[in-house]
Amino acid sequence: MVYFTAEEKAAITSLWGKVNVEEAGGKALGRLLIVYPWTQRFFDKFGNLSSASAIMGNPKIKAHGKKVLNSFGDAVENPDNLKGTFAKLSELHCDKLLVDPEDFRLLGNVIVIVLANHFGKEFTPQVQAAWQKMVTGVASALARKYH
């Protein structure tokens, strides 16, 4: 279980309120697929993934990225119950989609990079540490069914 301090929760929620989920989600998922191309195997029905520009411009990738990042909104609202919050998604990704649990960690790191790139100086070391803790907790919760 991940424990968040009041300061960490405040840093996470303060930044989250400013996140454009559609934009950041599309960028995060797109970057994941570009930097870690083996993750594309789960998105073969999403159309053209032949190049970085095709991936970043793909409307299905953008839509799914938004959906993925919206689930992080659930984490922001329930930081003390990440395992419960992601129990059904963990089951889906483990039993039906057969996603490598390491991919959750990779996506979390990409999300942190996208947020840092967007928010610049506002993404202080303290904010980065809080968000890194959050994405690590979410990755662990999503991988729970695998254990």
UniProtKB/Swiss-Prot annotation:
The organism's place on the tree of life at top rank: Eukaryota
GO BP: any one term: hydrogen peroxide catabolic process
Keyword annotations of the record: Heme, Iron, Metal-binding, Oxygen transport, Transport
Annotated GO CC locations: blood microparticle; haptoglobin-hemoglobin complex; hemoglobin complex
Binding site for heme b: 64, 93
Limits of the Globin domain: 3-147
One Pfam family of this chain: Globin
GO MF terms held by the record: haptoglobin binding; heme binding; hemoglobin alpha binding; metal ion binding; organic acid binding; oxygen binding; oxygen carrier activity; peroxidase activity
Keyword Transport applies: yes
InterPro entries, alphabetized: Globin (IPR000971), Globin-like_sf (IPR009050), Globin/Proto (IPR012292), Hemoglobin_b (IPR002337), Hemoglobin_oxygen_transport (IPR050056)
Tissue: Red blood cells.
Function (record text): Gamma chains make up the fetal hemoglobin F, in combination with alpha chains.
Similarity comment: Belongs to the globin family.
Known partners and oligomeric status: Heterotetramer of two alpha chains and two gamma chains in fetal hemoglobin (Hb F).
Protein name, entry field: Hemoglobin subunit gamma
Organism annotation: Dugong dugon (Dugong)
Lineage, opening ranks: Eukaryota, Metazoa, Chordata, Craniata, Vertebrata
